[in-house]
A protein has these predicted regions:
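N-terminal signal peptide c-region/cleavage motif recognized by signal peptidases
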Residues: 19-23
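Low-complexity repeat regions of mature extracellularly deployed or surface/particle-associated proteins
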Residues: 27-186
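A short glycine/proline-enriched turn/edge-strand or helix-cap micro-motif
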Residues: 1, 25
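Hydrophobic helical h-region of N-terminal Sec-dependent signal peptides
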Residues: 13-18
Length: 186
């Protein structure tokens, strides 16, 4: 009887672990997520969950630096996939309801985020090689940003300082394009 009981507990524990691993793997970005609308990448809620980070680097020599700090009741979320090689992502998110979903599928792509402030939601997709995105949100609030680059050698620089309630969507499809967005509020 003892063996049967311990066998049942082991099966129940194994089932629970499989269920939990399924939940975590559903959070990780995959290359097939490139087919989704960019805002669909943020549908994972952070309600009551605090910080979260789901990272998948499939290629060689990809680098990720991620810092998230939670100071409120709900948290930051980051979902990162770097599929090619030699991609670099440097992500800093601080308090409140920040989210980020980043896909860099090609090679030699660079992404950097310095974020502070309130209700930030970001989606960044770089599908190509030698692309660069730099975002700085200084003392900002309620920012929703979607930046998509499909092609090679493209660059987006977005600097927002003391901005209240912004919503950006920039899509570059092609090669060798550059956009600089700099806004300063009071």
């Amino acid at each position: 009887m003892t063996n049967l009981l311990s066998g049942r507990i082991s099966l129940a524990t194994a089932g629970l672990l499989m269920m939990l691993s399924g939940l975590v793997s559903a959070q990780v970005l995959n290359e097939s997520d490139l087919l989704l609308q960019p805002t669909d990448l943020l549908n994972t809620s952070t309600q009551g969950a605090g910080n979260g980070a789901y990272i998948q680097q499939l290629g060689n020599e990809n680098e990720l630096q991620l810092f998230q700090q939670q100071e409120g009741l709900e948290g930051n979320l980051a979902r990162v996939l770097q599929s090619g090689q030699w991609n670099i992502a440097i992500i800093t998110q601080t308090d409140q309801g920040n989210k980020l979903a980043l896909i860099q599928k090609g090679s030699n792509n660079y992404y950097e985020l310095t974020g502070t402030g309130a209700e930030n939601e970001l989606v960044n997709i770089q599908n190509g090689s030698d692309n660069r995105i730099v975002q700085q949100f200084l003392n900002s609030s309620q920012i929703s940003s979607e930046l998509v680059q499909v092609g090679n050698s493209n660059e987006i620089v977005q600097i927002l300082e003391n901005i209240q309630g912004q919503n950006f969507t920039v899509r570059q499809i092609g090669d060798g394009m550059k956009v600089i967005i700099k806004q300063t509020g009071q």
